[in-house]
């Protein structure tokens, strides 16, 4: 062609754009995305014309993604430039066309010349301001679309590819390898072709989804005619009571709507059984509120309130489990074991022996002791129970106990008067002290004991230590005799 030789980009139909047409799953969950743009970098895999390629990383653990087809082919099928799924429902082209009864297999030519001419005609209409876009979004979805459509992004699709060296056992990168160290999945889903996905022919993913839609059954009504309540599960904070009422009111008059926020569910009760059956038939497997797919089933009848209250009241009235107490509710209680204290009557909490404040080592107040403070002759209001200081039987196996002074601390209730002095026994000095050079010899114990305290002169110049030590020794000696 002459315009190909002139290299006129606009006349040749080469695409030049500023932003790609992609779905939310391919864009990723990161609000700050850095894209690189390369004009006329690759050729479209459908029409084989050069186009602008965008490349970015959807997330931290995702692989780099890039556009695969041009925007002209993307607008003809209303699909994403990367994954080639429908932009509105997130389904393959074959599933969407089958559900909406659209035959687009022969509308787009497949030969090189006819395909290029077809694309140039659509580009010419777009430059002229004519509406050439498809009417896929203008059609009303049917039951199959509502059952299979994706309401939330699927970011797992952006994971890295499987490492081929890891499959052969030759990967030396270890944890630093940017690819997944997993075994690949084999089967029909692993054999996919981008052209079959675009034209909607022999797509294994579409075959699986269509088979799943055929297996979905309707919601069967329960045999109990008194049940008029429907259970709605999978709620979130964005769904309000008015949203649920607007969705269910078209099928019958609603008696009440009860929302349990902590359990993310709601119960819709109709005034008649016919309204509940109609809502279950119309909304089964296709209940979507505010973009959130919800689960719809029949509600169960409430349990007996009297039996539940009686069982709950018996559950906390003793030490035995609930099952044993319920069995013994109409029977006399068995005899208590010898090592178990019988629980007091009419108690709300269990009783254990360790809860008795009269046990050894517990702090007993004046009121709990019951007049014990009067017997102690002005003792403190609370005291620790100490073991009595008395003789104990000898321990077995020839164990020699420690001296009495080391067993228990001295009793501080009776303090000695300041005038009383206790001298060490004579056994504390087994040997006489040797006089050193230039010191006076110490008097013998007999000489000290013979001297009377009254015979010592009042104004003598004896050292204070010797004059005070003699009366102490004599007192101790006299008391020992």
Swiss-Prot record:
GO BP of this protein: defense response to bacterium
Sequence ranges assigned to domain RRM in this UniProt record: 228-301
Record has Zinc as a keyword: yes
Skewed-composition ranges (Polar residues): 472-481
The keyword DNA-binding appears for this protein: yes
InterPro entries reported for this sequence: Cwc2/Slt11, Nucleotide-bd_a/b_plait_sf, RBD_domain_sf, RRM_dom, STL11/RBM22-like_N, Torus, Znf_CCCH, Znf_CCCH_sf
Keywords from the named record: DNA-binding, Metal-binding, RNA-binding, Zinc, Zinc-finger
Region (Disordered): 329-481
Low complexity bias spans: 369-389, 399-410, 449-471
Segments forming a coiled coil: none
Stored Pfam families: RRM_1, STL11_N, Torus
GO MF term set: DNA binding; mRNA binding; zinc ion binding
Biased composition regions of type Pro residues, renumbered to the chain: 331-345, 423-444
C3H1-type zinc finger segments: 157-184
One GO term describing the cellular component: nucleus
PANTHER family: PRE-MRNA-SPLICING FACTOR RBM22, ZINC FINGER CCCH DOMAIN-CONTAINING PROTEIN 4-RELATED
Official protein name in the record: Zinc finger CCCH domain-containing protein 4
Species, as recorded: Arabidopsis thaliana (Mouse-ear cress)
Phylogenetic lineage: Eukaryota, Viridiplantae, Streptophyta, Embryophyta, Tracheophyta
């Amino acid at each position: 062609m002459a315009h190909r030789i002139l290299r006129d980009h606009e006349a040749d139909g080469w695409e030049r754009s500023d932003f790609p047409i992609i779905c939310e799953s391919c864009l990723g969950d990161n609000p700050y995305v850095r894209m690189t743009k390369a004009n006329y970098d690759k050729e479209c895999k459908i029409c084989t014309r050069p186009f602008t390629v965008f490349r970015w990383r959807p997330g931290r653990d995702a692989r780099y993604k890039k556009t695969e087809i041009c925007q002209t082919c993307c607008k003809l099928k209303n699909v994403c430039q990367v994954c080639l799924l429908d932009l509105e429902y997130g389904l393959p082209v074959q599933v969407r066309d089958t559900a909406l009864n659209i035959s687009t297999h022969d509308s787009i030519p497949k030969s090189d010349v006819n395909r290029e001419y077809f694309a140039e005609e659509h580009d010419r209409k777009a430059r002229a301001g004519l509406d050439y876009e498809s009417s896929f979004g203008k059609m009303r979805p049917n039951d199959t679309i509502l059952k299979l459509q994706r309401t939330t992004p699927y970011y797992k699709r952006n994971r890295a590819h499987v490492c081929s060296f890891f499959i052969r056992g030759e990967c030396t990168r270890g944890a630093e390898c940017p690819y997944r160290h997993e075994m690949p999945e084999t089967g029909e889903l692993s054999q996919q072709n981008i052209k079959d996905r675009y034209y909607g022919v022999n797509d294994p993913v579409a075959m699986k989804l269509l088979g799943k839609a055929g297996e979905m059954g309707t919601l069967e009504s329960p045999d109990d005619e008194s049940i008029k309540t429907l259970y709605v599960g999978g709620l979130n904070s964005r769904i309000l009571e008015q949203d649920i009422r607007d969705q269910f009111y078209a099928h019958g008059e609603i008696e009440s709507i009860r929302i349990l926020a902590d359990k993310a569910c709601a119960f819709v009760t109709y005034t008649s059984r016919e309204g509940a059956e109609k809502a279950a038939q119309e909304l089964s497997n296709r209940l979507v509120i505010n973009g959130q797919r919800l689960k719809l089933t029949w509600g169960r009848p409430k349990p007996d309130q009297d039996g539940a209250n009686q069982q709950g009241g018996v559950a906390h009235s003793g030490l035995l489990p609930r099952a044993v107490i319920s069995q013994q509710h109409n029977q006399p209680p068995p005899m208590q074991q010898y090592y178990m204290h019988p629980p007091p009557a009419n108690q709300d909490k269990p009783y254990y022996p360790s809860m008795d404040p009269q046990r050894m080592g517990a702090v007993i107040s004046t009121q709990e002791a019951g007049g014990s403070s009067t017997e102690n002759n002005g003792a403190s209001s609370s005291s620790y129970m100490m073991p009595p200081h008395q003789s104990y039987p000898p321990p077995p196996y020839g164990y020699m106990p420690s001296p009495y002074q080391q067993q228990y601390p001295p009793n501080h209730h009776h303090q000695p008067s300041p005038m009383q002095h206790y001298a060490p026994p004579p056994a504390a000095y087994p040997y006489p002290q040797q006089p050193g050079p230039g010191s006076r010899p110490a008097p013998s114990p007999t000489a000290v004991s013979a001297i009377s305290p009254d015979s010592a002169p009042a104004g003598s110049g004896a050292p204070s230590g010797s004059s005070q030590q003699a009366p102490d020794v004599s007192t101790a000696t006299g008391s020992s005799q």
